[in-house]
Amino acid sequence: MIGVFRLESQMLPGNGKFERTGLNSDGKCKEAANTAFNYLKANGNRISGTISTTTKDYIINYQDLQGIGMTEKLALPTLIALCSIALGKPTLSSLAVLGEISIAGTMLKVDELANALQVCLDSGAKKVLLPITSAADLGTAPADLIGCFNLIFYQSAEDAVYNALGVE
């Protein structure tokens, strides 16, 4: 089942700790969140030279808004949340983030794209961040469903962050 999740982030002075709340004991979810933080530590300077993973502590709270269980596809949304708080830039309003990244930044396409878009619509999203690798699957979704969104394609993890934050 496809769900809706909200991430809320906080940044504090510190020494590079990353705390995740709301994931309970789900190891795969924690691993996905850690993937994002490790990616940021290794590649943050490619996003912005002002991001510090050594002098700041980060906290992200994960909320399952529909109570269906937490998704394991948290690396990309976590990376976007971390960059948002680190740069002091909010994400675009009414944005849904689809897709996932690996530790190396490889984009993973969206499973069940038509169903995922329907959940986005039902949840009030107006903009959908989508990996370019899923563009070929748009034919599986009804045209009137696709027409409900401003689709924003990304080609890399950095591109996804820039697009989510509305940075050119």
Label each PLM-derived region with a short phrase.
Residues M1-E168:
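Peripheral, non-AAA+ core regions of ATP-driven protein-machinery
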